[in-house]
From Swiss-Prot:
Gene: lspA
Entry protein name: Lipoprotein signal peptidase
Pathway(s) this gene product operates in, as recorded in its UniProt entry: Protein modification; lipoprotein biosynthesis (signal peptide cleavage)
Cysteine disulfide partners in this protein: none
Source species of the chain: Shigella boydii serotype 4 (strain Sb227)
Superkingdom of source: Bacteria
Catalysed reaction equations from the record: Release of signal peptides from bacterial membrane prolipoproteins. Hydrolyzes -Xaa-Yaa-Zaa-|-(S,diacylglyceryl)Cys-, in which Xaa is hydrophobic (preferably Leu), and Yaa (Ala or Ser) and Zaa (Gly or Ala) have small, neutral side chains
Keyword vocabulary terms for this entry: Aspartyl protease, Cell inner membrane, Cell membrane, Hydrolase, Membrane, Protease, Transmembrane, Transmembrane helix
Length: 164
């Protein structure tokens, strides 16, 4: 039985494109205007800081010799395909799940582009309190985390809200 793509969660793929444009645009601006390691204070506790991440979150496996680039690229592709299939199986009206999946796909594809094009992921958001700095991250990472948080939130909502 075929169904109109507009009636499925794939209707929300426009959000993937928005995340990609914002993420890749921010990384382009950093690459054009910052030297590696440059820092510009924005607000108390928030800097723009150009860093390269050769691993995953928190630079996991960053010093592993290069194989991790392809490993994490494969994970990004696999997760994106799985979530796109899940979106296809969902109704377009199931907003929370579709938004969550679209944010995760957009973030995964943004970081995938960096891995394949540059060989590293461009990070630039430096949050700190006093002398303690959180791991530097980017807007793709933010989209992935917000998407994951929405999935957790959806799990706590009453079942009637889930069916919409």
């Amino acid at each position: 039985m075929s169904q109109s793509i507009c009636s499925t969660g794939l209707r929300w793929l426009w959000l993937v494109v928005v995340v990609l444009i914002i993420d890749l645009g921010s990384k382009y601006l950093i690459l054009q205007n910052f030297a590696l390691g440059d820092t510009v204070p924005l607000f108390p506790s928030l800097n723009l800081h150009y860093a390269r991440n050769y691993g995953a979150a928190f630079s996991f496996l960053a010093d592993s010799g290069g194989w991790q680039r392809w490993f994490f690229a494969g994970i990004a592709i696999g997760i994106s395909v799985i979530l796109a299939v899940m979106m296809y199986r969902l109704k377009a009206t199931q907003k929370l799940n579709n938004i969550a999946y679209a944010l995760i796909i957009g973030g995964a594809l943004g970081n995938l582009f960096d891995r394949l094009w540059h060989g590293f992921v461009v990070d630039m958001i430096d949050f700190y309190v006093g002398d303690w700095h959180f791991a530097t991250f980017n807007l793709a990472d933010t989209a992935i985390c917000v998407g994951a948080a929405l999935i957790v939130l959806e799990g706590f909502l009453p079942s009637r809200a889930k069916k919409q």
